[in-house]
Regions:
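Metal-dependent phosphodiesterase/phospholipase catalytic core, i.e.
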Residues: 1-71, 77, 90-93, 97, ...
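C-terminal active-site rim and adjoining tail of enzyme catalytic domains
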Residues: 73-178
Length: 178
């Protein structure tokens, strides 16, 4: 299914869920891909329901430059021990990282730098609660209903303390898709 077809379906079915759109460029097509995504999102007026991320920093920077109000993130792959401190200077709204790479120390460092962390792909309640306890701001899951219930229960007894400066839009704690 194409992005365009998915958005049409979501609008038609009045689906009250946001999209995390991951750009996966190949062979230097990142800029072109980013512009095409921008065009589709604008054509269907879907920016308020969308956030964007990529392993390719240049691709998300195209979106950030063209649409600074849109929420964009950088996807970390690999060991957090291999990440240098320049990551905290990136022009991004959040970081997404693979669940088996997350550590309390890294998440707390992100909190100190006021960078929300989203963890993928978390598909069981115990792990969801564990990552929320560690201080993550969002969960990326293949089971949105389970994720939503877990987050709602968690928020009843825990203060949501991560920084949100009002720029961009989502105060997102759950993202669907894996």
């Amino acid at each position: 299914m194409t992005l365009e077809n998915l958005i049409k379906k979501m609008k038609r079915d009045k689906m009250a869920v946001g999209l995390l759109i991951e750009l996966k460029p190949t062979q230097d097509n990142g800029e072109d891909m980013a512009h095409k995504v921008i065009d589709i999102i604008e054509q269907y007026q879907f920016s308020r329901q969308s956030i964007f991320m990529s392993l390719d920093y240049d691709s998300v920077q195209v979106i950030k430059k063209e649409k600074p109000q849109w929420w964009v993130g950088y996807c970390i792959y690999g060991s957090v021990g291999d990440i240098d401190d320049s990551i905290w200077e990136m022009d991004i709204d959040f970081l997404a990282m693979e669940e088996n790479r997350a550590s309390t120390a890294f998440i707390q460092k992100a909190v100190r730098h006021m960078i929300p962390i989203y963890i993928w792909t978390v598909d069981n309640t115990k792990k969801m609660k564990q990552y929320l306890d560690m201080g993550v701001c969002g969960l990326i899951t293949n089971y949105p209903h389970l994720g939503k219930l877990t987050v709602e229960e968690y928020e009843k007894t825990h203060f949501q303390y991560y920084y949100y400066d009002g720029k961009g839009y989502p105060k997102t704690t759950l993202i669907t898709g894996g």
